[in-house]
């Protein structure tokens, strides 16, 4: 059984909440576009800022009308039917304009979509009509982008392969950052296993303003009977000299010295941010690539949960440090479902 340490409430009280997107419709019964910006770190209050942008909207296909062959068919605008919802992450750039200018430029984008497959199902985005506010992102938009389908589409199986598909942007999520760099723990360091070490993981508990059961995300009841969601992230490992005994108090003392501050952002949907304002050991600092601010996008940790809650209100209710023995190197990781005898798979 693992030992835990609960961080004080003030560690996530200030920026541990994300407000919901207002899902309102206009006279045409279409969703009214909206932009939602949150701050992470210490971004400037005015002027130039570093902004990470995620576009949210609907996948649509042209409606099949009657083949009348009249001249009006050439002048009437094509109507579309929704076949799914999803997102398009366009990344970080230095932005000079206003929120409303950015929203207008995003909803004016003409985005065509194609569903394909490599080692897994993918969604290909091709972008046109890039206006001035989006010029800081123009290089990656013009090149086209491809993403794991399960990360950016709520139901990729609903996207037809024999029809034209467009992605209509309705909402824009933005994360205003204090730096142009979003630091993530490299996979090689996150998978690091050292002898005589303790793995420090964080159990993050959330309260979401949306019912998730019908979409396959089962909540957990807390002590008060409230429905909560949770996920885990790996912070790093604590290592002591051979022969030294790890006590719970020793681990807690290490964590308290870090003075961790937690916040929620909108990188890739919902993102969890950790900022160390205290002292870290050299071992832990090296695992965090010598960064004191780290981002954990839920899109990478739990894609399905992210898809379900990315438009809702989300609040951190608690964060616990979980102290567990590091997994020995001898343990084998099997990323594939099909394995023969000891897990070896013959590759073509």
Swiss-Prot record:
UniProt GO cellular component terms: viral envelope
Pfam families, sorted: Matrix_Paramyxo_C (PF23765), Matrix_Paramyxo_N (PF00661)
Keyword S-adenosyl-L-methionine: no
Domain of life: Viruses
Keywords assigned by UniProt, alphabetized: Disulfide bond, Viral envelope protein, Viral matrix protein, Virion
Gene3D superfamilies recorded: Viral matrix protein, C-terminal domain, Viral matrix protein, N-terminal domain
Annotated signal sequence range: none
GO biological process, one term: virion assembly
Disulfide pattern: 251-295
Cell compartments where the protein resides: Virion
Presence of the UniProt keyword Disulfide bond in the record: yes
A GO term for molecular function: structural constituent of virion
Main localization (coarse): virion
InterPro entries referenced in this protein's UniProt entry, alphabetically: Matrix_C, Matrix_N, Matrix_Paramyxo_C, Matrix_Paramyxo_N
Job description of the protein: The M protein has a crucial role in virus assembly and interacts with the RNP complex as well as with the viral membrane.
Family: Belongs to the morbillivirus/respirovirus/rubulavirus M protein family.
Protein name: Matrix protein
Annotated organism of origin: Human parainfluenza 1 virus (strains A1426 / 86-315 / 62m-753) (HPIV-1)
